[in-house]
Amino acid sequence: MKHLGCLVVFVFLSLISVWGKGVKEEVSVRSLLKEMVNREHLTRFPYPDYRCWQVSSTDPLSVSPDSANWFANSDRNNFLGIDSVNGRKEYILMDERPPGAIVRFWATVARYSQKGILRIYIDDKSVPAVEGELLKVLSGDILLKSGPLNQSLSPETEYLKRGHNLYLPIPYAKSCKITYESDSLKGIGNNSGEILYYNIN
């Protein structure tokens, strides 16, 4: 009888656990920020589970350790394509369809005109949710005042030679497309004009 009682309690607790996990929690900027600073949460396997993906300006020839081009190092100006939007040429940095969140965006530039416009389109909308000069979006004051979630490093380095970081989570329910517009870019993979290096998680 004792074993039966233990079995009933175990089944009951298991059902509560399953039912609890069936409840969908809304993923928002607020929930993601809370997750980032909750030390207890960091020690547990995430629920709902997720995968970390990265898009970057990595040299597309570097695909496999077995390849002769594994050490190809033209890790700049490698975009997914080009969109023409209202007469603008927007280079595509990221175009993801499943639900997710941008949790880290790093970029650095060379021969930068300081006029490049970054746009983040969320959930198939034609109007960007975020739009502004690249470095002001990442480490300036467009999304956040100066703080730990948006920094350019190192302060000892000339501003345009720094790495610019944004850790403010930006969730999306359907899709996210990130584009970059700059008249100083000379095309995909072309390094004769402005140069952009980036990583987005």
Functional labels for PLM-detected ranges:
Residues 10-19:
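Hydrophobic h-region of N-terminal signal peptides that target proteins for export
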Residues 1-8:
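Bacterial N-terminal signal peptides that target proteins for export
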Residues 8-9, 55:
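A ubiquitous, low-specificity "background" feature that marks scattered single residues
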Residues 21-201:
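Beta-strand-centric surfaces of beta-sandwich/beta-rich domains
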